[in-house]
Regions:
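Sec-dependent N-terminal signal peptides
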Residues: 4-14
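Gly/Gly-Pro-rich "capping" loops immediately C-terminal to redox-active cysteine motifs
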Residues: 140, 144-168
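The canonical Cys-X-X-Cys-His
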Residues: 135-145, 179, 183
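C-terminal capping alpha-helices of c-type cytochrome domains
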Residues: 169-191
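Sec/Tat signal peptide C-region and signal peptidase I cleavage site
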Residues: 15-21
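Boundary regions of SH3-family modules and the immediately adjacent low-complexity/disordered segments
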Residues: 59-127
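Beta-loop motif signature
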Residues: 21-47, 51-53, 61-62
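Short, flexible, mixed-charge glycine/proline-rich loop motifs
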Residues: 129-133
Length: 191
C-alpha cells in the first residue's frame, strides 16, 4: 500500500504543473462559443485564461483516425479526456500522425476550449481521496479489493460497468466517472 500511495502522489504532482489544473467535475466544453462535447473529471489541462465564469483551457492527447469523437490520454493509454457530440476534425488541431503497434493511424492533437471556471481546480489529491474512499467502500463489500494497478486504463471502465450492469453495485454517474478516473490514473501500463 505504501508504493500505491507513492504512485498516487507522483501522479498528482505530474498532473499539477505550472498553469496546470484538473477538471473537478465532468463538464461541457465549447469551441468558439458553441458546445462541442464534454470533458471528463480529473482531466489535466493547461489554463490559458480565466474571464469571470468562463475559462479557456488547452488540452493535449490522441485521437484515432477511425474515431474522431474523443480525445484520449495517448495512443497506448485509453483514458478518455473528451467526448465530442459529433465526429469532426474541426474539434482539435492535429500535431502529428502516429501509427500504433497494429498499424492503425492516430493523431497527436491539441485543442483550446472554453469551460466553466468553477469546474477547474488544482487539488487533485482531494478528488483522489474521495474516489479512493468511495471505491473501497463500494467494491470491498462484495469481494477482495483489486489494486488500482490490477488492470490497464482501458480495462477499468468495462470492469466497473459490468458490476453496475449485473446490479451488484449502484453508482451515480458522477461517482462512477470519478472512481474510473482515479483507477485509470493508477492503472498498470498497457503492454
Amino acid at each position: 500500500m505504501k508504493s500505491f500511495k507513492f504512485v498516487l502522489i507522483a501522479a498528482c504532482a505530474a498532473a499539477i504543473g505550472l498553469n496546470a489544473e484538473v477538471l473537478t467535475k465532468t463538464t461541457d466544453i465549447s469551441l468558439g462559443g458553441k458546445k462541442v462535447g464534454k470533458i471528463e473529471v480529473l482531466t489535466p489541462v493547461e489554463v490559458v485564461s480565466k474571464d469571470g465564469a468562463k475559462a479557456k483551457i488547452k488540452l493535449k492527447g490522441a485521437v484515432s483516425a477511425n474515431y474522431l469523437a474523443q480525445i484520449q490520454r495517448s495512443v497506448k493509454n485509453a483514458e478518455i479526456f473528451t467526448v465530442f457530440d459529433a465526429e469532426s476534425e474541426a474539434n482539435f488541431k492535429k500535431i502529428k500522425e502516429v501509427e500504433d503497434d497494429y498499424g492503425e493511424l492516430w493523431y497527436e492533437v491539441e485543442g483550446t476550449y472554453e469551460v466553466a471556471a468553477d469546474a477547474l481546480g488544482s487539488d487533485a489529491n482531494a478528488l483522489y481521496k474521495q474516489a479512493q474512499q468511495k471505491y473501497e467502500e463500494t467494491c470491498s463489500a462484495c469481494h477482495r479489493l483489486h489494486e488500482p494497478n490490477s488492470f490497464t486504463a482501458a480495462q477499468w471502465p468495462a470492469n466497473l460497468q459490468s458490476m453496475i450492469d449485473t446490479n451488484y453495485v449502484s453508482l451515480e454517474e458522477t461517482e462512477l466517472n470519478l472512481i474510473v478516473k482515479y483507477l485509470q490514473h493508477n492503472a498498470k501500463d498497457a503492454e
